Amino acid sequence: MTPPPPDDAHPARWRALLLLALAELLGMGLWFSGSAVAPQYRALWHFSAEHVGWLTTVVSLGFVAGTAASALLNLADVVPARRLFALSAVGGAAANALVLTADALPAALAWRFLTGVCLAGVYPPALKMIATWFRARRGLAVGTIVGALTVGKALPYLVHAVPGAGVAPVTLAASAGALGAAALVWLGYAEGPYPFPPRPFAWGLVGQIAGAPRWRRATAGYLGRMWELYAAWTWLPAFLAAGVAARDPAAGAGGERAASAVAFAALAAG
């Protein structure tokens, strides 16, 4: 059997990176699609400002639940990556669009939670998928995917900055992007020359890993960083919108669009 060429010479590696980066860019817009139009939802359902953050928080909770379930069920090894990604993206697109059918905040939060669950099959699998195409430059490839999904999360704010883009256009644009991501991966992705061997979930290793001081410190640092980052991403757009309204009460929709454009730039910068 002829060994595969080294990853810095494989002819299809950059195509795979471009395809997965574009898929993440399109698919991750589901995350903040509710937050981008939170002021409109608040006016529609008459909930307090304290509840606005839940439109994003429940997505994160759903993502955590979905990731944990995926790990326990070993989905990344049981289900082919292309299928897992595509089905998750389609499910997320549907759950996100169904928010438009909600008549009150609790129903919307349920759909947003399910959206987060589905995103657990869009974000983590893509990192494993691209790693099968790279070895020496794996860090560059994974970093590119993370950068693409970061910009993708910010896209709903860019859509909201377009004149006339309210709740339905922003929500449906995010769902359409996720469907596009599913189509890209389903039709265009193939596993790379460096696949990972399937491994069952090993309960016996949980205590061993959790007992490692370096793992605990690294995990605590990562959790703290993510807490800070997502709190800032949720707070900043609301802060910008409130600042514009306080500075120029007559700005109206134009000021809201300007705040969304700045929010997009800030979130996309990471």
Q: Where on the chain are the PLM-derived regions?
A:
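Helix-loop-helix hairpin linking two adjacent transmembrane segments in secondary transporters
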Residues: A136, T144-Y189
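Central cavity-lining transmembrane alpha-helices of secondary-active solute carriers
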Residues: T57-L73, F264-G270
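Extracytoplasmic gate region of multi-pass secondary transporters
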Residues: G34-A38, W215-L267
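Short hydrophobic/alpha-helical segments at membrane-entry points of transmembrane helices
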Residues: A104-R112, R217-A218
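Extracytoplasmic
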Residues: R15-A49, G66-S70, A232-L240
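Cytoplasmic helix-loop-helix junction between adjacent transmembrane helices
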Residues: W111-A148
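Conserved MFS/SLC helix-loop-helix module at the cytosolic interface between two early adjacent transmembrane helices
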Residues: T67-P106
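Juxtamembrane intracellular "pre-TM" segments in multi-pass secondary transporters
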Residues: P3-H10, A190-G221
